Curated annotation (Swiss-Prot):
Protein's name according to its UniProt entry: Lectizyme
Native species: Glossina fuscipes fuscipes
Domain of life: Eukaryota
Annotated compartments: Secreted
EC numbers, comma separated: 3.4.21.-
Family to which this protein belongs: Belongs to the peptidase S1 family.
Catalytic residues identified in the record: 72 (charge relay system), 119 (charge relay system), 219 (charge relay system)
SUPFAM superfamilies associated with the record: Trypsin-like serine proteases
Length: 274
């Protein structure tokens, strides 16, 4: 029987013994299968969303006051945004911003909750991120990622980033990354079942027959493409088939290019309320 679930919380590998336990709708651990440690400073735009002491979603800095994430991640009234985090054991270069209520959060008005289209949200931070700060070794601690301009294709070779559990079930200290093949809506639709909740506002990562093309990344985390003009945020981790360890189905992302006007209008409208 097939089940859908929104990617959640972390990057993990699940043993065969655990498959039955997670084969149900919900928010199981997301994962980067066959990934590797990212270089320090490789993804200065990624943030960790934390409630209490726990990481629950990823996100991306798109401006000094704004973070872009998945709509399904915005479930808490209060949480922290941790930027500049590379190693869990070293927070010397991080910038922490507090979210104190729903007034700082914008979820797309057509997102219906759970698995489905329009899974996108914005977070406003009162204290801007310092985008000019450098780490002790001279790398950029925190930076924004570019939104797609339309100059470059959203499909092709891409990269994912995220934290979470490793193959042994322990939390890795270092940010993880994975190279992926990004495909468009039509190709993804052909690879999924006809009744799957895929929409033209989605793109996917997929390598036919490969498990590492499924269930990747932190919910809300970035899928990017490296262009001659810099790194572009082309997708936001949204949902995929469960159980992850046995599926070769595509992973599904919110396609950021489909929401460029929504992002622009939401930021402008929010500014009028300040």
């Amino acid at each position: 029987m097939k089940f859908f679930a929104v990617f959640a919380l972390c990057v993990a590998s699940v043993s065969a013994a655990n498959l039955d336990a997670i084969a149900k709708p919900g928010f199981p651990a997301g994962r980067i299968i066959n990934g590797h440690e990212a270089d320090k400073g490789e993804a200065p735009f990624i943030v960790s969303l934390k409630a209490g002491k726990g990481h629950f979603c990823g996100g991306s800095i798109i401006a000094e006051n704004w973070v872009l994430t998945a709509g399904h991640c915005l479930i808490f009234d209060e949480f922290e945004i941790v930027a500049g985090l590379h190693s869990r054991n070293d927070e010397s270069d991080v910038q922490i911003r507090k979210v104190t209520g729903k007034h700082q959060q914008i979820v797309h008005e057509k997102y219906g909750g759970g698995v489905g289209p329009n899974d996108i949200g914005l977070i406003y931070v009162d204290k801007p991120f310092n985008l000019n700060a450098l780490t002790r070794d001279g790398t950029a601690a925190v930076a924004k990622v570019n939104l797609p301009t339309g100059k470059y294709e959203s499909t092709g070779k891409g990269k994912l980033y995220g934290w979470g559990l490793d193959n042994s079930g322990f939390s890795p200290n270092i940010l993880n990354t994975l190279d992926v093949d990004i495909i468009g809506y039509e190709e993804c639709k052909n690879a999924l079942n006809s009744d799957d909740p895929l929409d033209p506002v989605n793109i996917c990562s997929y390598t036919a027959g490969a498990i590492d093309g499924a269930c990747n990344g932190d919910s809300g985390g970035p899928m990017v493409r490296i262009t001659p003009d810099g790194t572009e945020l082309v997708g936001i981790v949204s949902w995929g088939y469960q159980p992850c360890a046995s599926t070769t189905m595509p992973s599904v992302y919110t396609w950021t290019s489909a929401f460029d006007k929504w992002i622009e209008d939401s930021i402008k409208n929010y500014a009028q309320l300040l």
